[in-house]
Amino acid sequence: MTLFILTETSAGYALLKAKDKKLLKRDDLATEAATAEGVSNLVKLKSFQKFDSAATALEEVASLVEGKVTPRLASLLDEVKDEKKVSLAVADPKLGNAIGKLPGLDIQLIADSTTTDIYRAIREHLPTLIPGLAPQDMSTMSLGLSHSLARHKLKFSPDKIDTMIVQAIGLLDDLDKELNNYAMRVKEWYGWHFPELAKILNDNLAYAKLVLKMGMRTNWESSDLAEILPEELEGSVKAAADRSMGTEISEEDLENIQALAEQVVGFTEYRQQLAGYLTARMNAIAPNLTALVGELVGARLIAHAGSLTNLSKSPASTLQILGAEKALFRALKTKHDTPKYGLIYHASLIGQATGKNKGKMARVLAAKASLGIRVDALAEWDEDATEEDKAALGIEARFNLERKLAGMEGKPLKPRGVTIAPNGTPAQAKKFELNEARKYNADADAVDEPSSAKKQKKLVEEVQDTEMADADSDAEADSSDESEEESSKKKSKKSKDADLEKMAEKAGLSLKRYKRKLERGEIEFDAEGNPSSISKKDLKKAKKEAKKADKGEEKKRKRSDDNEDNEKKQKKKKKKDE
């Protein structure tokens, strides 16, 4: 079986043919291939395809690193198709698998440890095998290709892109601090001239723009502030400038104040631009993490971990307390409760929860965020995949977490089974249209013929009925009894009402008041049966006296019981003494 050796160089592809078919099985291969003459005696050049330029060489080598067969390499291997019983030695097993999948190529591939000795000798003495290739040119091309390949790898490295996020969030935090310091300095400096302005305007950007626009407060009549402030604030600012109590300043002082105000405006605009850049980067690199915790919290988590890959290796428990390391170690040292959350506390989902549910929400959010980070870091998407497809896990998880939070807080739940829009809000359902019902066609009815009655067998022997009273007579008797009962009830009610009225007159009360007092027990009857009303005070006194009497009786009973017990004890002692 003929043996061919595929060699990838910085100058091009070389296909070498072994002079000995059993070259790889020889024991003295390493010693014979130690010199250039020995290598030339073992193999010879079959074909060589040179790269056209350095860019072409970079594309070819980058494809080989990924284990892909390029069209240039496939055309070189077409020269071996016509030969029968061919074996091909390849240095990279991944590339060997890709070559084996080429259609119409019946080749036995060899990509194991037996090829290491021959490849070491070929690379060492390559200029002697390829005519017209100087050793100096070969080293120069190898150095240039290695630099280009390293630059290519760094360009598409995910760690390098993470560095952009880390630097952006760090710069954003620094800008916030500097902007706060500069804005406060502008207010303090310009406040000597116009102290009332700081109480009217709270926005730092609007304050700096107004300082640049108006300058001296005496220019309030000629300055148009409609572009900066609404009408209400504009009127109040001009009124305050007219009767301001501030001191006068020179033009040189105003120039320095306005120079600082320009810095505030410039930094604010750049901060807005940087925030937009950070949002776009986070949506491109970590869409699921951004959907769950937001771009700022997600960027701070990545910056704290160092990279997205390092963050994806962290479990949910670590992600939950990331940023609270000092509090964690202090709690472990003092044996107190450990913190429930770190940087993740600033996520909007945890901010919506109340104090009791913040810890639960942090734990659940950290678990979902860890899954989203792993998808962002390790998932391989097609080129046709949209941003919605990449962030589908995070959007769905956020919807479920919002539903869970609403359940914990006792708020109305969002409906399940609703399609979720890319921004995380449920999509509106389609309009339901009610169609008219089909009318019934009466003309299509048909009349069935009467079926012949079938004789049924008797299941039980029939018994002759005995004569009973008519139903009408029974009904009449029942109705008469009911009418008599009703009339008797009415009579009894009337007699009771009449008696109550008489008793109420004797007691000197109305009928309603007499009934109420009678229910409460505030009516007393003498020996003759005449009623009399009792006041609430008298009732309370009577109840107290009754309670005292009950207590006295209980005390007497206890005393008698104690006396009996003492007598029994004395009798027992006497018996023992005897």
Swiss-Prot record:
UniProt feature, compositional bias: Basic residues: 569-578
Question: Which Pfam families does the record associate with it?
Answer: Nop, NOP5NT
Q: Any one Gene Ontology biological process term?
A: endonucleolytic cleavage to generate mature 5'-end of SSU-rRNA from (SSU-rRNA, 5.8S rRNA, LSU-rRNA)
Q: What is the name attached to this protein's record?
A: Nucleolar protein 58
What are the record's GO terms for cellular component?
box C/D methylation guide snoRNP complex; nucleolus; small-subunit processome
Its main subcellular localisation, reduced to a broad class, is nucleus
Q: Which organism is it from?
A: Aspergillus oryzae (strain ATCC 42149 / RIB 40) (Yellow koji mold)
Bias-annotated ranges (Acidic residues): 462-485
Q: Which InterPro entries match?
A: Nop56/Nop58, NOP58/56_N, Nop_C, Nop_dom, Nop_dom_sf, NOSIC
Q: Which part of the chain is the Nop domain?
A: 285-410
Enumerate the residue ranges of region (Disordered).
Answer: 443-578
Keywords associated with the record:
Nucleus, Ribonucleoprotein, Ribosome biogenesis, rRNA processing
Give the matching Gene3D superfamilies.
Answer: 1.10.287.4070, Nop domain
Ranges of Basic and acidic residues composition bias in the record: 495-505, 547-561
Q: Briefly, what is this protein's role? A: Required for pre-18S rRNA processing. May bind microtubules.
Q: Looking at the keywords, is Ribonucleoprotein present?
A: yes
Report the subcellular localization.
Answer: Nucleus, Nucleolus
Output one GO MF annotation. Answer: snRNA binding
Family label = Belongs to the NOP5/NOP56 family.
